[in-house]
Amino acid sequence: MSRIKRGTTTRAKHKRILDQAKGYYGRRKNTIRIARQAVEKAGQYAYRDRKVKKRSFRALWIQRINAAVRAEGLTYSQFMHGVKLAGIELDRKVMADLAMNEGGVFTAIVAQAKAALPKAA
């Protein structure tokens, strides 16, 4: 039985890690032990931030809608309540886009939401 040396597999593993660490600063790009840690941490950040990205965009849409709605004399929560009562089925992403780019259309939606709100006694 001949002896098996694992040089080729080790080199392939190292090459894969160093390719992923391309563009990193200092020894992170060319020292395997440090590059492995950096690539691992980068993967953890990427996984976490794919979740955070969804929250961040939702918060951005809410801020944009809130700013546009306050110019019309409503708060965000009042507007969303009016939208629900009026039966308007647009999500926050679309409404934020309308508020930014199609002011007239958004003003019409705000008017519908205002009309659907119950009058204060």
UniProtKB/Swiss-Prot annotation:
One of its GO terms (biological process) is ribosomal large subunit assembly. It comes from the Bacteria. InterPro entries: Ribosomal_bL20, RIBOSOMAL_L20_CS, Ribosomal_protein_bL20_C. GO terms for molecular function: rRNA binding; structural constituent of ribosome. Keywords: Ribonucleoprotein, Ribosomal protein, RNA-binding, rRNA-binding. GO terms for cellular component: ribonucleoprotein complex; ribosome. Binds directly to 23S ribosomal RNA and is necessary for the in vitro assembly process of the 50S ribosomal subunit. It is not involved in the protein synthesizing functions of that subunit. Belongs to the bacterial ribosomal protein bL20 family. This is Large ribosomal subunit protein bL20. It comes from Sphingopyxis alaskensis (strain DSM 13593 / LMG 18877 / RB2256) (Sphingomonas alaskensis).
